[in-house]
């Protein structure tokens, strides 16, 4: 798929989910490079930079997209010629997509060990990583029940309950505001993440923080399922995560309320680290305090690069 179409599909939520948009961005840049017909390296660098900015501009909050794009373009500045750069981009993209897919599988295996037979689980939005944990536990023969939130305004919970229902899992969809009411029946909560800061705060679909607070109040374990490429290197240097806001038309129809009334429609919220029991990653189960260590010592420049 070309860069323009990919950017539009990410922006209009046709492609959604932090991991999915990261893989889509990597794939689009690979296709762009593969179809490039020019031979001038300076022009190629300029064009690939434009393509990169289009992709990154489609979803400003998700660091997964940023890391996926930069992993795909890693080393291009040192390429000898266009052919070398194209080969490098295609190889990087293939590697990133394979590692991203593999990470979800590993998270499923690791996280499923935290689920016991008979558990009642709650999840929010539509996280591939969280679903991997839940479905892996079910495939292991554990009898579980799942409460999945509707996740307004885009109702990503519809995708989640369809996935779980087709797998044969006992699933109930609840309205977002029923989270606190239902939490007394829940044993564990599993959610995904769009971005995790260096100090362990979790940026995810709006209402995640309320769900975490309800779990904390009820003393229910709250797990974040996240690939490590969703850890934000920019927050190491003090940058904050921009919270994307979307159109009021996702909430109300034009003319439904007076023009003088404002509508605030943030896509994400921030869950403080203290409400997170553990982060389940492809590297293992870790505390929120371990995010800094992973960014600095284990991943380093292999995936993350500093924007100049």
Q: Model segments located where?
A:
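Long amphipathic alpha-helical segments
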Residues: 1-87
